[in-house]
Structures are given as structure tokens and as C-alpha cells.
Amino acid sequence: MKTSTSILRACTFILLSAAALACRAETGVRVLNDDAHYPEGPIWYQGKLYYVEYDRNAVMTWDGKKNSVFSSDKGCGQSAVVPTVHGEFLTTCYDNGTIGRMAADGKVLPPYTHDKDGNKFTGPNDFAPDSRGGIYFTASGTPPDALDGKVFYIAADGSIALKAGDLHNANGIAVSKDGKILYVVETNENRLLKFRIGPDGSLSDRQLFVNLDDLTHHVVHIYPDGVKIDSRGEIYIGQSARETNVPLAGVIFIVNAVGVLLRQLTLPSLQVPNFAFSPDEKTLYVTAVDQIDKSPFLGKVYSIPNR
């Protein structure tokens, strides 16, 4: 997809130029946790940042001063956390194929193990709550190629139904502010899809929203990961670089509602898989990974000025 240079308000993608290299990191970056073990899936809720540490099998909180363990669930392999309308929390348990449940105090509750038709969840990954009290989530699919990714929907009454399949490593997911569009990342295809959301939560009219190869005009895939949408409808796309020398490592891409690149944010880490907004959206909380080749997948949690 072609972009206008007039709207690239941060760095342009002339990545080998001196100007681009000088723009490798944003100002005002703050480290909130410098010993995170594969941090992922954050959300701001009731005055705290909730996020997971996959390699610690833990849900963490940051209250503005310190990081604390909120809940642990050995074998889960948490990838994201989200509150429900019933005062519980859910986690995507990537390793054991369940949707973990926690009480408001962090106590582990019996998990969701399948949908209403008996479909299992292979590699649960990320959440997207809607305005009806329901929550969409992705199931990445069977490694290594993950060609059987899916999207499920947890209704407010706790029932779970399959809504979309045939996704190639389904990953980040987000609902548009008007509740009419669902965006889904296909990491292995380096693209972001969109679906029309029906009144009953059904998905239809599957379309390509943006191909990241076209967006970046670079030969190396960025492997898109998490996706979030702000109050202006701007779409933030994280990424998980799979090589250590990728020029676009640490970059969050921000596009408008038609997929045109607006700007980028750059963090001093290799992977920036996911993020969450502060209530006023002036701060972006970013989970990042520096050690991508082996456990404990050391990373950081950052805050960065937004806009």
C-alpha cells in the first residue's frame, strides 16, 4: 500500500539513512520492569497495569510504583489478560490450550476448555472485549505453521462459540470503536484482516485490511503481533521480530482506518508484541522482549509518551 510522505510524522522508512538511524528510539521512554520474562498482553484496569509474563506463568500488576504477582497458574503459558463484566479475569493459556479464569483476588478458577460444540482451543493468544460484555479471542493454531488458527467469542453469559477459522497464526485482535469491525492479525502472512461484526457477534465479509510488506516496503517480514485501537480510530500494530538484525525491530506502526501509515513509535528492544493505553491515551504501556532465542525470554515493560 502506498503512503504519503507528508503524513509520516515520525521517521520515514529510508532505514539505512543517517536520519532514520537517529530516530531509533523515542524520547521519554521509561522502564517499569527490567526483569520481565516474556511480558505480553497488557491492559489498564482500575488504576493498575495488568500484564502477563509467559515464562513465569504469571499475571502481574504495576500500580505506578512496583510490580507484583497477581496470580500464578503453572502450565498455562499466559499470553494475555482481560477483565470480564462479572468481576473475574481471563487469561489466554497458550501452552495448555485453555482460557484461564481468575477471581478478583487472583485465585485460580476452573478454566474454559472448549466451546459449546466441543471445539478445543489450540494456542489461545489474545483478547478483544466488545461493548456487549463479550470477548473475542484468537487461537493461533497448531505449530509450527499454525494454518488452522481460529477466532472464538465468549458471550456475557459465558457461552463460547467459534466465529472464524482458516487463519494462519491468528494473533492480535481488536474491535473498532463503533463495534462494527473486528481486526485480526495473521502473523505468518504478515497481514491484518478485518471482518464485519453482526448484531449477534457473528463475523462475515472477511477482507485484507493491510499487508505489512506493502506498508513498510522492506524485504524482511516484521511479523505483526498485537493490535489496539485508540479513541480516534487509529490502529496500533506491534511486532515480534524473529531475527536480531532486523532494521524494523522495536517499531510499533500506527495506521488510520483505511490502512495508511501515520507514524511509528520505536522502543529500544527487539520485539514489541503488545501494548495498552493509559486512560487518557497520552501514555502507551509496552511489553517488550530482548532475548528471543531461549528461556527465560528476558524483556521489559515500558511506558512511552503517545502522540
Give, region by region, the residue ranges found by the protein language model:
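Short loop/turn segments immediately following beta-strands, especially the blade-tip
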Residues: 195-202, 306-307
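Blade-level signature of beta-propeller repeat domains, shared across WD40, Kelch, NHL, RCC1
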Residues: 276-307
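A short loop-to-beta-strand structural motif that recurs across blades of beta-propeller domains
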Residues: 58-60, 98-100, 149-152, 191-193, ...
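Short glycine/acidic-enriched loop and turn motifs that connect beta-strands
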Residues: 56-58, 96-97, 142-144, 189-191, ...
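Bacterial N-terminal signal peptides that target proteins for export
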Residues: 1-12
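Flexible "stalk/tail and boundary" regions
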Residues: 45-48, 62-64, 68, 85, ...
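A short beta-strand motif characteristic of beta-propeller blades
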Residues: 28-33, 66-72, 110-117, 159-165, ...
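Beta-rich, blade/repeat-based domains predominating
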Residues: 33-48, 54, 73-93, 98, ...
